[in-house]
């Protein structure tokens, strides 16, 4: 059994397969996932697990060089934005329109669906390198 924090086999496999500039997305329960994008559904009920719980877990193993967030989170969910900023530290953020984020999911290695039920709780993580 793994000793690391990510024990979900599908998430672990995607992280292991990530290369430089590859993307992985995490989102709320309502985010539409394009056909062809791998969906890893970890939601079990409203709010469980939360977006922040899943993001924290994935950040424990994935080297992230940049994140993408929807512009709309600034006004529609500032509490979630503050929580994300606290987790990612100095990692650069690029704000994009929510419609663009939905399109960019086509390029993601996978989308992890959480039980989050707050608006614009979605992120695209761009993989960095550890050297």
UniProtKB/Swiss-Prot annotation:
Pathway participation: Carbohydrate metabolism; D-ribose degradation; D-ribose 5-phosphate from beta-D-ribopyranose: step 1/2
GO biological process, one term: D-ribose catabolic process
Keywords, sorted A to Z: Carbohydrate metabolism, Cytoplasm, Isomerase
Gene Ontology MF annotations: D-ribose pyranase activity; intramolecular lyase activity; monosaccharide binding
Principal subcellular localization: cytoplasm
Keyword Thylakoid in record: no
SUPFAM superfamilies xref list: RbsD-like (SSF102546)
Active site: 20
Keyword ATP-binding: no
Function, in words: Catalyzes the interconversion of beta-pyran and beta-furan forms of D-ribose.
Stored NCBIfam families: PRK11797.1
Name of the protein this chain belongs to: D-ribose pyranase
Organism, scientific name: Latilactobacillus sakei subsp. sakei (strain 23K)
Gene of this entry: rbsD
């Amino acid at each position: 059994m793994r000793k690391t924090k990510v024990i979900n086999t599908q998430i672990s496999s995607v992280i292991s397969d990530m290369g430089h500039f590859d993307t992985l997305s995490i989102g709320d329960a309502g985010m539409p996932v394009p056909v062809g994008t791998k969906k890893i559904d970890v939601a079990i009920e409203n709010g469980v697990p939360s977006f922040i719980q899943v993001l924290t877990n994935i950040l424990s193993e994935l080297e992230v060089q940049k994140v993408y967030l929807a512009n709309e989170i600034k006004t529609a969910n500032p509490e979630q934005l503050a929580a994300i900023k606290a987790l990612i530290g100095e990692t650069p953020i690029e704000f994009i329109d929510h419609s663009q984020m939905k399109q960019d999911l086509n390029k993601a290695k996978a989308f992890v669906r959480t039980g989050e039920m707050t608006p614009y709780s979605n992120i695209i993580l761009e993989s960095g390198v550890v050297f």
